[in-house]
Amino acid sequence: MKLLTSVPGSCVFVSVVLSSAVSAADFSAVPSGKYLVDPTHAYINMQYNHLGLSNPILGFDEFKISMDLDSASPTNTKVNVEIVTDSIDTGSDIFNEHITGEKWFDTAKNPAITFTSSEVAANSDGTFNVTGDLTVKEVTKPVMLVVTINNAMIHPSKKSPVVGISAVGGIKRSDWGLGANAPFVGDEVKLEIQAEMFIAE
């Protein structure tokens, strides 16, 4: 299971933050084009409150992230995420079986979770608001994503354009048919995404 540290902030599920050591809007070092996630440097984790006793972190081990970057006009950029639902890893085989069952993600009938962006707006602090459609268990609802850039550069060893991203966002799981045991198990779910994305060759 690929885990990150716990997610700060309030309710978060799918909000993508692309965070920057330099200017968040500075793509001058990389060209426009399609960028694909490096699976060896990428994480998608979610967190929720359990009875007020703990804040478990669950992760997905298989997913694709693509970004059609317009480096000259970043607000024209498009982002797509596809998660293999059955790749969820709770750290427990027993809990994995439970959460992939019909009561929760029902992965036999719902093999993928998807997010497709529809609009990107720049913020004064250098982040971006990304609005798009999140589909979970055949339910599609709009979600706003907050986006920043960690770095955009030519990778020092691979000599290829790369963009580093961090992501946070939030939903109420009950809005997507995942409301079992609420409010004892928190309805608000947090997500953190970290990913390095290389230009497609």
Model regions and ranges:
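Low-complexity, acidic/polar, glycine-enriched regions of mature
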Residues: 23-201
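Bacterial N-terminal signal peptides
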Residues: 9-20
